[in-house]
Amino acid sequence: MTKVRLGNLYLAAAVAGVILCAVLMRAFYMPYSGFWRTVLYNILIFSWAVSVWWRILHAQTRHCLLGAAALMLFWLDIRLIRYDFAQTPEMLRRLWYAYYIPMLLIPTLALYTLFFLDRGQSAPLYKYRYMIFVFPVVLFSLVLTNDCHQLAFAFPPGQEVLGSPDYTYRFVYYLCLLWIFSCAVFTVVYLVRRCRIPHTKRILWLPLVPIFLAALYALLYKHILNVPWMHAIAGDMTVVQCLTFTATFEACIQCGLIQSNMGYATLFEVSMAKGLITDRAFVPVQLSLIHI
């Protein structure tokens, strides 16, 4: 096993350990578990965002992934505020409305990122590419102002301010679901096409596995909530969606679908050409085996 693969295994084990700690905190209801779980997930996503900043070559792709990471941090933090710090029904309701900002924009950014998978740094950008953000911005604006029109959620008469749980869904809510579902389907279809290895029938399955797990989780979510031990371990929809998004695009990076500034060690391990890379002081940091 190469040093690069061994390092990746150590990193994956560390990430799995952090997630396991967070899951155990939720399962055993440790004091302040919501706060500490959010801290752990924030550290994971922030660390991934820092790695994206250093690894991703294409500026537009890097900005999309960093924007998605910022939205995930926002989602986790407003959820913590809603459950641990919010005091009034109005504050609870408005924080709940704010969930729809990342819920709508993260799938949109995933779709937007696909525009750049086939394009180099100097390739001309699509002229109307930003139009893709108009519809989700309109939708989450309608959700945030729902108290004025109740086009997303309708509350019983006289209980609009109190935020009664006996609400009904209206057509803006279903438009939000339709947009999220459409972005997810288009992303999966595009990734399946891009994951097909040229001139073969083989497919790179790694980027598709997190999407499949996220879809399976969404389908089983109501069943999970009805089983106490499953709800305790895996009842956190926000965390699951954030982690599967991160895993999907990290898989795209590892498979080479997203260009990255990595893989030099592997290249030098298998290269038959003489070569080396030095640091700024001209001290060799990578040598090809034949050079040694």
Feature map (PLM): residue ranges:
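Alpha-helical transmembrane segments
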Residues: G7-A22, G67-F74, V134-V137, P210-F212
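Conserved small/polar residues in nucleotide/adenosyl-binding loops
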Residues: I290-I292
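Alpha-helical transmembrane segments of multi-pass integral membrane proteins
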Residues: W54-L76, Y97, R129-F133, Y167-K222
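Individual alpha-helical transmembrane segments in multi-pass integral membrane proteins
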Residues: P31-F46, I56-T145, Y174-L177, M237
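Extracellular-loop-to-transmembrane junctions of the mid-late helices
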Residues: N8-A13, A27-Y41, V143-T187
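Interfacial "cap-and-anchor" motif at the non-cytosolic start of specific transmembrane alpha-helices
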Residues: T2-Y10, C21-P31, V189-G263
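Juxtamembrane "helix-exit" motif on the non-cytosolic side of transmembrane helices
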Residues: C21-M30, I78-P89, V143-P157, Y217-W229
